[in-house]
Amino acid sequence: MYKDKYVFALLVSFIDRNHFNYLVSKYGGDKYVKFFSCWNQLLTLIFGQLSNRESLRDLTVGINVHQKKSYHLRFGKHVTKSNLAKANQNRDNRIFEDFAYFLVDEARRKRAVDIFKLDGNVYTFDSTTIDLCLDVFWWAKFRKHKGGIKIHTLYDIETQIPTFFHITSAKVNDVNAMDVIPYEIGSYYVFDRGYNDFKRLYRIKTLDSFFVVRSKKNLQYKCVKWSRRLPQNILSDAEIELTGYYPHQYYPESLRLVQYWDEELNREFTYLTNAKRLSALQIANLYKK
């Protein structure tokens, strides 16, 4: 008889079950449940993800192939498609959402490094659109004959771990997702050109956080003062004020504008930031990383 643990059981043995049980109790996940517990549901979904299952039917078939080993694999009793579907539909999703963020925090602590030598964390924020079949996901209508959702992700650059997710309709403009980012005091947030929303950028500044964003080419501004001695590849390092009517209303204070020449890509980048104590090269490296 095989006495060692299966690989899947070894993988999930690192999961903090005590904290998961705390969340289950907090949200009443196992209330009136006799067989298919939240823990069984979690392991079933993890198995489906790791084995690239494409549907609930595919997942339950894959699990029931190993029915005699289900105890050692920690799935519990016989897993059916209907039980799994009901659990996914009826149980409080906050159990799994909170536990996912708990695992992310654990992973970040174990991978903590100090690449930038800064006091705060460094994040980048961007979105990706996932196409969906309208016949199946009718609620995700994006265009006339196309469905989709957007996943907005906050990514910790130093640990290389995503720390926050926000899912919206594909129609939602990227800048709207800036409103739900859990900003941290003293941390740095790096954005691409599509996030040039000065009202939202000013909010970051008022929260005592820092941002670095690529500037649009049609930016209207005037220089207040600038540095004369510039390091290699820094074309300009200036303090500016926005002169456009609405941009100035939304961001009434001065900004820092850094122009950088990237030798690898053979092109120029222009950044806006409220981080005035960092060097110009540090600003460029925050975006480049």
Task: Describe these PLM feature segments.
Residues 69, 93-97, 106:
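Short helix C-cap/helix-to-loop transition motifs enriched in small/turn-promoting residues
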